[in-house]
Amino acid sequence: MEPIITIRSLSKIYGEKVALNNISLDIYPGQIIGYIGPNGAGKSTTVKILCGIIQDYDGDVTVAGINLKENVLEVKKKIGYIPELSEMYDLLTPREYLTFIGKLFHLEDSVIANRSSKMLESFGLLPNIDQRMDSFSKGMRQKVLIISGLLHNPQIVILDEPLSGLDANAVIMVKELLQVLKAEGKTIFYCSHMMDVVERVSDRIVLIANGEIVANGTIEELRKDSSDSLEKIFSQLTSSDDGTERAGSFASAYRDNNTNGEHE
């Protein structure tokens, strides 16, 4: 099977900061890839390059046989991008916003209306279809963002902390939705800090630190002969300790008897 996404020698530098350092990766159709790493590791930069948001980089990226640098607009048609609470036109209603998004992908009005209604209903938002989104909670806006990223039935779905602000029922639904999309042959690139979710839903886990891939495999392969959780593996590969020492040091800041403002 040919990979649907091929990344070769990908590098990106911001001034003197190396965000990505010569990473290479193959992603195959029907896979859920968990892409994890500490803050500043290069996760968001990778996502923005794949989505065509950042176009100034070194290396080669091919998506569905299309060179990203040569035809970024064609690649964007194949990708559904679901970020963590990006800027929205929140003076619009969900109906207006999703119609706008659908038009960007040249969908017919009837298709937009049908898909929007069904997806909003699944999230319990159909009664709010004509309500301005500036009155929505964080979770409600995130649900609309998820719908907007899937409205055009993309071949590849890229999610960057998609569960932010969602209620428990919506989280369960999204996790089930990922499995449905996978069964349909879609490729899921899931970027998150939520280790327990990544561990449960991913076929492969790619761990990035300091702009470099430090682990790439199934959870079983990453565990090797241990039974450590993904959280423990993450800590072992990206930190000098398991967090216990740092947590104790943090807590000692307010236990210091000489600290000004201490409450008796």
Residue locations for each model-derived region?
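Conserved ABC ATPase "signature" region
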Residues: 99, 103, 110-128
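A short, surface-exposed alpha-helical micro-motif characterized by mixed small hydrophobic
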Residues: 198-200
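Catalytic Walker B motif of ABC-type/P-loop ATPase nucleotide-binding domains
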Residues: 157-161
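ABC ATPase "signature
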Residues: 216-217
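Conserved ABC transporter NBD signature motif
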Residues: 59-70, 74-75
